[in-house]
Amino acid sequence: MKKKNGGKKLNVLLTIKKIGINGEGIGYYKKKITFVKGALPDEVIVCEIVEETPKYIIGKLVKVKEPSPHRVEIKKEYSESGAYGLAHVSYEKQLEYKRNILLDAFDKYYRIPKPDKLVLKTLASPTTEHYRNKNQFPLAVRNGRVIAGL
């Protein structure tokens, strides 16, 4: 059962441990996994608890107390548009995070053993701003093999 925080603001201090498969920071509050959009691994943050379920918590980033060395300032219009999910991360670290997000998804949803041997390093784009693309590739396992369709 999902519950909102009943109008009460509860701000908590979290250390972010890793990036989730949707690009959100993951920390733990009272041993419960807590997702915080905009937070990065190794950061100490203050977040407001906005939703809690029996399995997880969603927090809203209030303040970064100890920023990641990979955090970069972004233009205000980027942060407001919602189109730049990892724009607050240095580009080199974005490439690493994106590969790790894919590896985590393969491991979590497809139980592919050692997927790191199947996924090459993320290729850098010559253009890192002012373009927009989105690719989605449906994947499935059939007869023990991964298949992709478009």
Positions of PLM-derived features:
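SAM-dependent transferase fold signal centered on methyltransferase-like domains
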Residues: 1-150
